[in-house]
Amino acid sequence: MIAMQPETQLKTALKNGFDPNILYKDPLTIVKEPMCTILEKHSKIPVDKVVSHVNKVRDRAFAVFPYACIGQFSFVELSIAASPYYPEMLERVKNGHKLLDLGCAFGQELRQLIYDGAPGESLYGSDIQQEFLNLGYELFLDRATLPESHLIASNILDRQSPLFTHLTGKLNIVYISLFLHVFDFEQQITVAGNVLDLLAAEPGSLIVCRVTACRDQGVLNATAERMPYYYHDRASWEQLWEVVQKRTGVKLCVDTWEQPDELVKKHPLPGIYILGSAIRRV
């Protein structure tokens, strides 16, 4: 049985009084680097059109699914290159390893990799919303660069979905940013196990995460009454991977750190911070 999906969670939250407009930020007046340069150089958008282009795509996306990362323009603040594991990720992909951005939204982090020299044929993205993947092409204007067959609309909890049909055991790296918190703790264990199955069953297979965490779980996770998410702290994150190892029998080396992030400054919920983590198969 497939567990509750994010869009079902949102419908439940709206019914319980959650107002998505608190997640909607006024239109941008400037697009920060490196996104601005990527849109100019990679997407060939004239510099004087970049801001209006981004605003239009954001509004269309927020109408499809009102996530905070969309309403607050988090998708223009690229994060993958800030990971201390990015040099390894980029080098491995340049050498033929395959990388999946899970919960990729517009696939913006994939475009960072491509801009930095990664071949599009080694990159994959997946999101539950096909419209997000389509809007990614509208944002970056690059259908010729990133194969459409490499952007897969799937539910990571559904092992019969195209993601598993096409990629089980074939990936070397999975990047997960601001995605896992939309699942409860038990569902996150399932997601982690499924991700391990997508990766090659060999030492060095790597998961790199950017995780929404909180200082006071008791307070913040109480928001589950309206938006049933699960926010980690460092201890619960480490516990998650201990459980995953016990249930799967796969030995993992888990590296975790707290990292500065622009998201923290504008997140509407209290006590938010960002955990970075790398989970390597031993």
Curated annotation (Swiss-Prot):
SUPFAM superfamilies: S-adenosyl-L-methionine-dependent methyltransferases. This is Methyltransferase ausD. One of its GO terms (molecular function) is methyltransferase activity. Disulfide bonds: none annotated. Pathway: Secondary metabolite biosynthesis; terpenoid biosynthesis. Methyltransferase; part of the gene cluster A that mediates the biosynthesis of austinol and dehydroaustinol, two fungal meroterpenoids. The first step of the pathway is the synthesis of 3,5-dimethylorsellinic acid by the polyketide synthase ausA. 3,5-dimethylorsellinic acid is then prenylated by the polyprenyl transferase ausN. Further epoxidation by the FAD-dependent monooxygenase ausM and cyclization by the probable terpene cyclase ausL lead to the formation of protoaustinoid A. Keywords: Methyltransferase, S-adenosyl-L-methionine, Transferase. One of its GO terms (biological process) is austinol biosynthetic process. InterPro entries: Meroterpenoid_MTases, SAM-dependent_MTases_sf. It comes from the Eukaryota. Its EC number is 2.1.3.-. In A.calidoustus, the austinoid gene cluster lies on a contiguous DNA region, while clusters from E.nidulans and P.brasilianum are split in their respective genomes. Genetic rearrangements provoked variability among the clusters and E.nidulans produces the least number of austionoid derivatives with the end products austinol and dehydroaustinol, while P.brasilianum can produce until acetoxydehydroaustin, and A.calidoustus produces the highest number of identified derivatives. Homodimer. The keyword Chloroplast does not apply. S-adenosyl-L-methionine binds at D127, I128, N155, I156, R247. It is an enzyme of class 2 (transferase). Disruption phenotype: Impairs the synthesis of austinol and dehydroaustinol. It comes from Emericella nidulans (strain FGSC A4 / ATCC 38163 / CBS 112.46 / NRRL 194 / M139) (Aspergillus nidulans).
